[in-house]
Amino acid sequence: TPVDFNTQADALINCQRAARVAGGTVMDRPEWLTVAPDNSAVFCTLTNNSGRGVADPANPRIRNLHGHILKFSEEGNSPLATKFSWEIFLTAGDPALAAGGSNLVGDIEGDTFSSPDGLRIDPEGRMWVQTDHSVPGNSGVDGTTIDQAFGHNAMFYVDQQNKQSKRFLVGPLGCEITGLAYTPDLTTFFVNIQHPTGDWPVAGEAPRSSTIVVRRTDSQPVGNCQRPGGGRAR
């Protein structure tokens, strides 16, 4: 190997290379982990890997331009388990890109996206996915940029049961949506807007990374579609 592992410190400092030597699976740019509030599963975003030439079960698409999400479940739903199972929860992409190959299509139901990055499941079980595709980016189809295929980076709600995706908010030009925190009652979300371009957030001034606040005014949790007493919230 290009690294001499003489001590444990060598392995810790060069952990990626050490993992390769140990036979670890090379993943497609793992980014965020989140744990379901009932501790039943762990999810991991694999943002993309345009350089993948050989697929494997956990990274099933060569030239994986749009990424995927993995789900891990401990045997017997026990924190003491020594074994776990895993599945590909979702593959990102868009059927409109099928002309460029089946590896670009994905299996998202509803609002499609590329390059899942930020990931969190709130205490009521709502999964929130934040994206980080390059700008303008390569969609995989000649003449179509990622911006043209998917728009700006955004934040999505994804139903864990039917995998239906709904776009929640869209970031300004050039940004990555990353980071999510919330108040205990879930009526207020704090979302980070990182490295925007143009003149956001103040017109005519240099762009600045910022944290925005999203607040429900009817005392309901952000993402809850039901109003008190019936009817759907907007």
Question: PLM features: what roles do these ranges have?
Answer:
Residues 1-234:
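Sequence/structural signature of beta-propeller domains
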